[in-house]
A protein has these predicted regions:
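Structure-specific DNA junction-binding interface
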Residues: 1-136, 308-311
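Phosphate-backbone recognition surface of nucleic-acid-processing proteins
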Residues: 194-250
Length: 311
């Protein structure tokens, strides 16, 4: 394994500085929360995936909304939300059906509600999210195929009864990725979100999948991976985080007593790729610009975490 030291050190700097920004905003400090011009100008995900807006919405409105749900309803709710990954789409369905459960799930009715939203010019999918679009179930519209997928998973195959029996994240990942419209990275995101709930309690440090953005980040960070694969590299970062923060004199502020997890280390590679487009433009890359500028949101988020994390 051969590191590109400048980029490797930037990985740890970025993780620490992005977390510092999060903490300062959380404490109500005024902007700018950093002297880093790139972090001031462009939008970057949090160092901890769970602190991102959509993850927080999922926790508060889909999983821990104060109501009791059966395991199968909870799994259904998480997958439905994540296939669209957009708060307004969830709220649209919630306003049209008494609650989002398998009992109220009707492919035609849900589809009709979403179709009229599209005709009114409403976006029902999150732009930043890769969700496979093909006509796997024979429909022209992406949302119809996704609803048909949920119907196959939960009503026809009773996939929920297999998921609750899974002992590891990887077992569940293999079940979910066997379905059409679900790629490896999407399946990894879904099992991570399921693991936020009380339905399962899988270990987080046993399994990871490198997404497209993180592959670009890894390529910039390592000149040669040696005998390691991309997932080994992510695990290497996870296992060496304390040592590296110390080496670089970086005071990384954990949430509770929780270090960065494999999925966080994976995500940081993706953000590092974006950061390097501005910081080190000479590095060879297929993508040369960061698409999104930072726009401050007015409403403050009250952060919550899965109960089992004891934060």
């Amino acid at each position: 394994m051969k590191k590109r030291q400048e980029v490797y050190d930037l990985y740890w700097y970025f993780a620490c500085e992005r977390q510092n920004i999060f903490i300062k905003k959380l404490n109500g400090e005024p902007a700018p929360w950093t002297n880093d011009k790139i972090l001031q100008e462009y939008k970057f995900c949090n160092s901890y995936r769970v602190n991102d807006r959509v993850s927080q919405y999922l926790l508060k409105n889909v999983i821990y909304n104060g109501k009791k749900y059966s395991d199968e309803d909870m799994l259904f709710r998480i997958l439905l939300f994540k296939l669209f990954n957009k708060e307004s789409t969830w709220e649209l369905l919630l306003n049209n059906f008494e609650d989002i459960t398998l009992k109220t799930f009707d492919v035609k009715a849900y589809s009709k509600t979403l179709e009229s939203a599209i005709l009114n010019g409403t976006k029902i999918y999150n732009d930043a999210y890769i969700s496979c679009a093909n006509k796997a179930f024979g429909y022209d519209r992406k949302h119809e195929n996704h609803l048909a997928l949920l119907n196959k998973m939960f009503n026809e195959d009773k996939m929920q009864s297999k998921i609750v029996k899974c002992k590891t994240m990887e077992q569940a990942f293999n079940i979910i990725k066997s379905y059409p419209l679900i790629g490896n990275f999407m399946a990894y995101q879904l099992v991570t979100d399921i693991n936020y709930s009380e339905v399962v309690n899988w270990k987080e440090d046993e399994f990871t999948v490198a997404g497209p953005g993180s592959l670009r980040g890894i390529k910039k960070c390592f000149i040669d991976k040696g005998k390691m694969n991309n997932e080994d590299i992510i695990r290497y970062m996870y296992e060496h985080q304390d040592k590296e923060f110390k080496r670089l004199n970086l005071d990384f502020k954990k949430i509770g007593n929780r270090p960065l997890q494999l999925i966080d280390c994976q995500n940081i590679f993706c953000e590092l790729d974006k950061y390097c487009r501005q910081a080190l433009p000479d590095l060879k890359s297929n993508r040369t610009k960061i698409k999104k500028h930072y726009v401050p949101k007015k409403e403050r988020i009250e952060y919550i975490y899965p109960k089992k994390w004891k934060i």
